[in-house]
């Protein structure tokens, strides 16, 4: 099995004022399909933002999405996304004292620091 893991923004896709390279995206899509390459996006984006980029730029949907700044792993199977429960279990067991609320309280007084919106949160973020 061949695997290609890539970031999305400013690596595979533009982010900012640069235009998308449609020819490069078409080549990426065709080569990864033609050579049966498992595609993994490793990104700070959540699932919704990843899907929006797939739609906007015409890049292929990944087989695996390591998203939310590495705090979630999803697999695309049978027409839908599902969490990799093995990863969730691993993180939970490897960090049994993880307490997001305690961390929030600890950093609450830092000026300029703000939490992301609720839709971008998960138990490990």
Each PLM stretch: what is its role?
Residues 1-18:
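Asp-based phosphoryl-transfer active-site loop
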Residues 17-29:
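Conserved N-terminal helical subregion
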Residues 2-5, 24, 39:
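Membrane-targeting and insertion segments and their boundary/processing signals
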Residues 26-118:
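Active-site phosphate-binding/coordination module
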Residues 121-125:
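Extracytoplasmic ligand-binding site segments that recognize negatively charged/polar headgroups
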């Amino acid at each position: 099995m061949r695997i290609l893991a890539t970031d999305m923004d400013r690596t595979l896709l533009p982010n900012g004022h640069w235009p998308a390279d449609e020819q490069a995206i078409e080549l990426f899509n065709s080569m990864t399909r033609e050579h049966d390459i498992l595609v993994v996006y490793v990104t700070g984006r959540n699932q919704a933002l990843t899907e929006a980029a797939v739609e906007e730029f015409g890049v292929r949907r990944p087989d695996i999405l390591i998203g939310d700044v590495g705090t979630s792993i999803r697999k695309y199977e049978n027409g839908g996304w599902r969490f990799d429960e093995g990863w969730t279990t691993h993180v939970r067991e490897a960090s049994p004292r993880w307490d997001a609320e305690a961390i929030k309280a600890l950093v609450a007084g830092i000026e300029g620091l703000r939490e992301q919106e609720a839709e971008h949160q998960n138990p490990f973020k």
